[in-house]
Swiss-Prot record:
Cysteines joined through disulfide linkages: none
A single MF term (Gene Ontology): ATP hydrolysis activity
Organism: Cryptococcus neoformans var. neoformans serotype D (strain B-3501A) (Filobasidiella neoformans)
Domain Helicase C-terminal: start-end pairs: 639-790
Gene: PRP5
GO BP, one annotated term: RNA splicing
Function field: ATP-dependent RNA helicase involved spliceosome assembly and in nuclear splicing. Catalyzes an ATP-dependent conformational change of U2 snRNP. Bridges U1 and U2 snRNPs and enables stable U2 snRNP association with intron RNA.
Motif (Q motif): 403-431
Protein name: Pre-mRNA-processing ATP-dependent RNA helicase PRP5
Compositional bias segments (type: Basic and acidic residues): 20-114, 136-159, 258-277, 813-831
Sorted UniProt keywords: ATP-binding, Helicase, Hydrolase, mRNA processing, mRNA splicing, Nucleotide-binding, Nucleus
Length: 1072
């Protein structure tokens, strides 16, 4: 709103005019009378009206937004003050006070005119302080009044006929008690209220001036009245006065007691009200927490009674409460172990009873041989296989190879895609594997890298899926393709995309490293084909207690790069998946290398498989130019830069020229990547330690040509298909022949030319044997220095100076998994108190795991599992001994009758057996005595030989001669920890934990002995097994320390078991 031009300069903008509403102000009338100022008045009026509206609006908002409680109290005080001020300013109150004063004056005048005024008590006497009367004086006065009343009554009866009654006094009788008199007509105003007293005391005047209520505290007291002669009064006046006085006295006595009782009741009510107010003012949060504490106490008592613990009563000592707390801690530890055991079994897929499941029937034989194939005899078929890179088949009733795509019986959509891709004829592995798979046979396909193995199992899979009804909801996939690496799974998924579109088949790629929620969503929508890694497939099958997906409809399983998959430790996951699939499902295994040791595992999974081998088991393609250079490690990087420069000059006309550099470690890949970046080369690194997103982005950029160089570990040696890849450099030599074949196979794919250069140092001579073998198999040139290195190492092996390198992908992951299983079982048995079947790791080194041959007989699996209640630690018992701890813990078992006979020498045992055969009896007691003496003498002889005869014989000769150590404690316990897992031992014996244990328990804890591996026992006279010695003069402290150590070992054992479960799927230096 614009400002008025007539605003006064001495006022603020929002303040009203001081004389705006003051009608008595002279300027007001003059302003109205002055016509020249009329417009200004109107402007000021409108301005002030708008200003008042704004002020009222602000006042309303403040009232609405005010603090309720505070403002109410403030307004209450304000209203009371305003009411008091208003009563003081009101003229009506003054008139009422004047009327009361006039009524009091009339009352005094009437009292003066009354005849009773002659016996009025002097006000000075009435105002005197009362003198307390004794009981005798009260009785005497009452008796005198009674006699006076009798005389007056007798006089009245004698003169009742003749005497005329005197007029009664209209004045009220004199008040003889401390209570105020009852109101009469003289003491009432015109409206029936008592008049104001004429002579109020100064105290009453001051209280009336300060307070708005005329309330005063009244004291009940009796006045000491003077005696009077009843003869002075005539007529009934004396009677009335005396009787009224007597009644007043009686009423006063009664009122004193009544008032005291009422005051006591009032105080009790006030106390009750205060308590009620205190209860009402209690904080709701405090009340809620108090109720929770009571409920917790009740629940703890109920749990303690249910568990058989003694519940401590109120006022019990802290010792009983400490025992209950220790029991609770132990229960929590056992619950923690049960939870860990449940988690370890969470991803377990128990095999179902296939005989009780009604599976849908399916068809897996689709191949119908064409006429030209039917007319071909076996000799012609062998010639065709020989022309196609020497195809070798093992198995019965193998189909004949096919040379054109139309003879496979594929859908028309697949043929259109094949024509669009420009594939003229099938490759060797495709010509033989596709007819075999489409005939419904289990197949093992072994072919060189880049030979089209992926299409060899994809086309039969699509025909197989197309024959069945679509998947609806969460029925599960029809076909499952498993690969060892995420990159290979993604590549298979991309390669089958063109076929999926034309056939209207849904597929999902489920690999680790990404969120599982997307995979779960895809499974719920339904997918006929799932391309996955084994670990992620297990996660999907166990997600939400198996309600996400299942493999009941799965009838086609592919394991690509099967040997690498088992070598990386995927055997448990793969076997779980296969055991859950129906036994009649079709299974296919493909790989470029398939060692003979893997055949037993393959035949365990497959049923009468056909083994198809193209070009040898581990052979580099002839299109690849292989070069091997022997040089020192310091010169490798310089030579690498020279090769990159030379190749760049040779292929400068080619825009798409890619290079793949292999190293053996993730750190080496990152270091070499940084070195190449500093030299100006655009490159990327690829290894298992990188996130999945980074790995996918690196492969995508490499295939697109944005990054021409990639430094990778062997994680990229499988399935990476880049047609423009012309150069592969093995910066670090591969450690076995199969790895060399797969690394070199990344180039020269689909008939293209490629180059593979390998660096090997003199320190890596053990790898030279496999490289020479691979070069010989592929008929490549072998350098002289490499041949000399290989022959030298073979000579060392023959002489026993060196050990041969590993044979590559031979299933070493299976042995590693088996060892881990033994470690886990041993840890569980040790933790649960059973060490009878503990085995030494050294006894399992180099052991060959036997595989049972696959049979057609199906046996329902055992589904009985131990419950979680078995995971308890009740077997952990430690004896608390009353006495000082021994100086040395014996490493040999204590002699007892159970092991008495077993501990005898071989000659003694032979003599006993001979005596039994001859029928001679042997007394058990005599035998025990003899055995004890023999054992003692044998030990003494051994000790003398070791030079310990004096130390061992002295205690035996004089057992009581040993003096007690003044620092020895009264109680001790020995807690053995040698057989617990390493994580549990470390957790119980680290410095911080030992300090904490001593502070909590108050006992002394020291570590004795040394660690012995499982299966190894201490030698005679050697240090005992690792244990903890607990000492204290208080038994409760020793017991508390034992319980605390027990809890720590339980938690450490749980963590060790979980670590073994997590590490089961990953092993070796190859990470997924």
């Amino acid at each position: 709103m614009p400002r008025s031009p007539y605003r006064s300069s001495n006022r603020s903008y929002r303040s009203p005019s001081p004389s705006r509403y003051d009608r008595s102000h002279p300027s007001s009338s003059s302003r109205r009378q002055d016509d020249r100022k009329a417009s200004r008045y109107d402007d000021d009026y409108s301005r002030d009206r708008e200003r008042d509206r704004e002020r009222e609006r602000d006042r309303t908002r403040d009232y609405r937004d005010r603090d309720r409680d505070y403002d109410r109290r403030r307004d209450k005080d304000r209203y009371r003050d305003d009411d008091r001020d208003r009563r003081r300013r009101d003229d009506k109150d003054d008139r009422r006070r004047e009327e009361r004063d006039r009524g009091s004056d009339r009352k005094r005048d009437s009292e003066r005119r009354s005849p009773m005024s002659t016996i009025r008590v002097d006000p000075i006497v009435s105002l005197a302080s009362p003198v307390p009367e004794t009981e005798e004086e009260k009785k005497r006065k009452a008796k005198e009044r009674l006699e006076t009343w009798k005389r007056q009554r007798a006089l009245k009866e004698g003169k009742s006929a003749a005497a005329t009654p005197e007029p009664k006094s209209t004045a009220p009788p004199p008040v003889t008690s401390g209570l105020p008199p009852k109101p009469t007509a003289f003491s009432l105003s015109r409206i029936g209220l008592p008049l104001k007293p004429t002579n109020p005391t100064p105290l009453k005047r001051s209280m009336a001036a300060l307070d708005d209520e005329d309330t005063s505290d009244r004291k009940l007291q009796k006045l000491d009245l003077p005696d009077f002669d009843p003869e002075v009064q005539s007529g009934d006046a004396a009677q009335v006065g005396s009787i009224g006085a007597d009644l007043a006295v009686a009423d006063g006595d009664e009122d004193d007691d009544t008032v005291v009782k009422k005051e006591e009741e009032k105080e009790e009510k006030m106390d009750i009200d205060k308590k009620a107010e205190e209860d009402e003012e209690e904080d709701p949060l405090d009340a809620f927490m108090r109720d929770n504490v009571q409920q917790v106490v009740e629940v703890n008592k109920a749990d303690a009674k249910r568990m058989g613990l003694r519940v401590a009563e109120d006022g019990s000592d802290d010792e009983n409460q400490g025992q209950v707390v220790e029991k609770d801690k132990l229960a929590e530890a056992e619950a923690l172990l049960q939870q860990a055991a449940a988690k370890s079994r969470k991803k377990d897929l128990p095999p179902p009873d296939h005989s009780k499941i009604d599976y849908e029937p399916f068809r897996k034989a689709f191949y119908v041989p064409p006429v030209e194939v039917l007319e071909m005899d076996e000799e012609e078929a062998e010639l065709v296989r020989l022309e196609m890179d020497g195809i070798k088949i093992r198995g019965q009733d193998a189909p004949k190879p096919v040379r054109n795509w139309g003879a496979f019986g594929l859908p028309q959509g697949c043929l259109d895609v094949i024509k669009h891709q420009g594939w003229e004829t099938p490759t060797s592995i495709q010509a033989q594997a596709i007819p075999a798979i489409m005939s419904g046979r289990d197949v093992i396909g072994i072919a060189k890298t880049g030979s089209g193995k992926t299409v060899a199992f994809l086309l039969p899979m699509l025909r197989h899926v197309r024959d069945q009804r679509p998947v609806s909801g969460s029925e599960g996939p029809i076909a499952v393709v498993m690969s060892p690496t995420r990159e290979l799974a993604s590549q298979i998924y991309k390669e089958c995309q063109p076929f999926l579109k034309v056939l209207n088949i849904r597929a999902s790629c489920c690999v680790g490293g990404s969120s599982i929620s997307e995979d779960i969503a895809a499974m719920k929508k339904g997918a006929e084909v799932v391309i996955c890694t084994p670990g992620r497939m297990i996660d999907l099958l166990t997600a939400n207690n198996g309600r996400v997906t299942n493999v009941r409809r799965t009838t086609y399983i592919v394991m690509d790069e099967a040997d690498r998959m088992f070598d990386m430790g995927f055997e448990p996951q793969v076997m779980k998946i296969i055991n859950n699939v129906r036994p009649s499902a079709q299974k296919v295994l493909f790989s470029a290398t398939f060692p003979k040791t893997m055949e037993s595992l393959a035949r365990r999974i497959l049923v009468k498989p056909l083994e198809i081998t193209v070009g040898g088991r581990s052979v580099v393609a002839p299109e690849i130019d292989q070069r091997v250079e022997v040089r020192d490690g310091d010169t490798k990087f310089t030579r690498l830069l020279e090769i990159l420069g030379e190749m760049g000059e040779e292929h400068k006309d080619e825009d798409d020229f890619r290079t793949l550099i292999f190293v053996d470690r993730q750190e080496s890949a990152d270091d070499l990547f940084r070195e190449l970046l500093q030299r100006g080369y655009v490159c990327a690194s690829l290894h298992g330690g990188k996130e999945q997103v980074d790995r996918d982005e690196a492969i995508k950029n490499f295939k697109n040509g944005d990054v021409p160089i990639i430094v990778a570990t062997s994680v990229a040696a499988r399935g990476l298909d880049v047609k423009e890849l012309k150069l592969v450099i093995n910066y670090d030599a591969p450690n076995h022949m199969e790895d060399y074949v797969h690394r070199a196979g990344r180039t020269g794919r689909a008939g293209n030319k490629g180059t593979c250069i390998t660096f090997i140092t003199p320190e890596q001579e053990r790898f030279s044997v496999d490289i020479v073998r691979a070069l010989e198999a592929s008929k490549a040139f072998i350098p002289d220095d490499l041949k000399k290195m290989s022959d030298s190492f073979l000579g060392k092996i023959k002489s026993g100076k060196a050990r041969a390198a590993g044979s590559g992908y031979s299933g070493k992951g299976l042995e590693r998994i088996e060892r881990r299983r033994e470690e886990k079982d041993r840890a569980e048995k040790t933790t649960y108190g059973d060490t009878s079947e503990a085995l030494s790791l050294s006894s399992r080194e180099g052991a060959v795991i036997p595989y049972k041959a696959k049979t057609n007989e199906f046996k329902p699996p055992e589904t009985s599992h131990k419950g979680e209640a078995d995971y308890t630690f009740t077997e952990i018992k430690v004896d608390i001994v009353n006495g000082p701890a021994p100086d040395r813990v014996s490493s040999q078992p204590v002699f007892n009758p159970k092991n008495a006979v077993a501990s005898l020498p071989a000659q003694t045992l032979a003599a006993l057996e001979k005596a039994k055969k001859e029928g001679r009896g042997v007394d058990a007691a005599n035998l025990a005595n003899v055995v004890a003496k023999l054992t003692q003498s044998i030990e003494l002889t051994k000790a003398e030989k070791l030079g310990l005869a004096a130390a061992t014989s002295a205690p035996r000769l004089a057992p009581g001669a040993r003096t007690k150590d003044p620092d020895a404690t009264d109680w001790h316990a020995i807690f053995p920890i040698n057989d617990y897992p390493q994580k549990a031992r470390w957790k119980a014996t680290n410095k911080e934990q030992m300090t904490l244990l001593q502070e909590v328990s108050g006992a002394s804890i020291t570590m004795r002995g040394r660690f012995y591996p499982p299966g190894e026992e201490p030698a005679l006279g050697g240090e005992p097994k690792l244990s903890l010695l607990i000492e204290s003069n208080d038994e409760m402290r020793v017991r508390a320390a034992v319980e605390e150590i027990r809890r720590v070992l339980v938690e450490g054992s749980v963590q060790a078991l979980n670590a073994v479960d997590r590490a089961g799927a990953s092993g070796g230096r190859y990470a997924v």
